[in-house]
């Protein structure tokens, strides 16, 4: 699974927390950290006993099992990251059970069903918009508040703030909702701010975005499976540039395994950009460069063709 790394278990002995790992990018990241040998704490609100407001079947127990099957050690801890006492208890448990925390991935989101796309702010549901911002921003702030003291106990810690879109892309593109736009650009700025706070302790903080990701929800949207995803290109031809959640997972694993990762401190990164630098691939052996494709092909009005972009 980690053929892209000379050392099949470069993260053996590494302790990671993937906050928001029930599905999507968080699950892909947790699995790839596990494939690299890490112990991975995975959190979320949906368990075998209880579903979150998403009302979806994926659970954190499933994610933890996938981490262990990949070669790591997955530990599921039900956590609502809007509840400070729950996050504090989570970090206290990691501190008791492990010798510190090496990697923190903040992938908490939960706003898909709250966004009203292409609706101006004065028409958008205020309750949904504010709830979206709490889920997208407050959760990250709360988690950093409690987890970073453990992470900075020793040098070399890595913080990855997951978002949608690189800073360069988002600076020139309206993300179809004021609430969504603010949520995703705020997380990028948070990573930049954190980079200044963890650097004196030998830490690194970055913002990271996947490309057009074939998450569980996206596959369902197009009524396809991972095995048949190309069928979706009949409805949306530019879906040809899409990638699996494991691709951005390999990006995080590559960062965590890089002893020189501090060179990225404060930067806004993408799965495709890091693949070009580190040489890892998606599960099909390709290297999709989504944001370059979006600008140079889709937005340029060219026919859908991923040749040269994956």
Question: What is the role of each PLM region?
Answer:
Residues 36, 97-98, 111-116, 146-155, ...:
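A short helix-coil junction within the Rossmann-fold of NAD(P)-dependent oxidoreductases
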Residues 18-19, 106-109, 136, 157-167, ...:
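Structural signature of the Rossmann-like NAD(P)-dependent dehydrogenase/reductase core
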Residues 207, 227-310:
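C-terminal helical subdomain
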Residues 14, 72-73, 100-101, 151-165, ...:
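Active-site loop of short-chain dehydrogenase/reductase
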Residues 139-144, 158, 168, 187, ...:
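Conserved internal alpha-helix within the Rossmann fold of NAD(P)-dependent oxidoreductases
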Residues 110-114, 122-126, 157-200, 211-213, ...:
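Catalytic loop of short-chain dehydrogenase/reductase
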């Amino acid at each position: 699974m980690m053929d892209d790394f000379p050392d099949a278990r470069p993260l053996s002995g590494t302790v990671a927390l993937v906050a928001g790992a029930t599905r999507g990018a968080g699950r892909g990241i947790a699995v790839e950290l596990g494939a690299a040998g890490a112990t991975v704490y995975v959190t979320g609100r949906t368990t075998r006993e209880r579903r979150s407001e998403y009302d979806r079947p994926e659970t954190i127990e499933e994610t933890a099992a996938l981490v262990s099957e990949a070669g790591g050690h997955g530990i599921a801890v039900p956590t609502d990251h809007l509840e400070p006492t729950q996050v504090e208890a989570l970090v206290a448990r990691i501190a008791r059970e492990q010798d510190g925390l090496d990697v923190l991935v903040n992938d908490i989101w939960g706003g898909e069903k709250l966004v009203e796309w292409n609706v101006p702010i004065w028409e958008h549901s205020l309750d949904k918009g504010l709830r979206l911002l709490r889920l997208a921003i407050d959760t990250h702030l709360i988690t950093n508040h409690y987890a970073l003291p453990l992470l900075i106990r020793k040098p070399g810690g890595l913080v990855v703030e997951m978002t949608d879109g690189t800073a360069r892309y988002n600076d020139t593109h309206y993300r179809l909702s004021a609430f969504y736009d603010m949520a995703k650009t705020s997380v990028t700025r948070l990573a930049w701010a954190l980079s200044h706070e963890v650097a004196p302790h030998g830490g690194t903080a970055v913002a990271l975005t996947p490309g057009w990701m074939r998450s569980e929800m996206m596959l369902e949207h197009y009524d396809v499976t991972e095995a048949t995803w190309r069928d979706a290109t009949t409805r949306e031809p530019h879906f040809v540039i899409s990638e699996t959640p494991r691709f951005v997972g390999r990006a995080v694993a590559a960062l965590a395994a890089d002893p020189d990762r501090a060179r990225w401190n404060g930067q806004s990164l993408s799965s495709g950009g890091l693949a070009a630098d580190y040489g890892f691939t998606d599960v099909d052996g390709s290297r999709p460069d989504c944001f370059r494709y979006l600008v140079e092909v889709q937005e340029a009005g060219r026919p859908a063709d991923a040749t040269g972009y994956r």
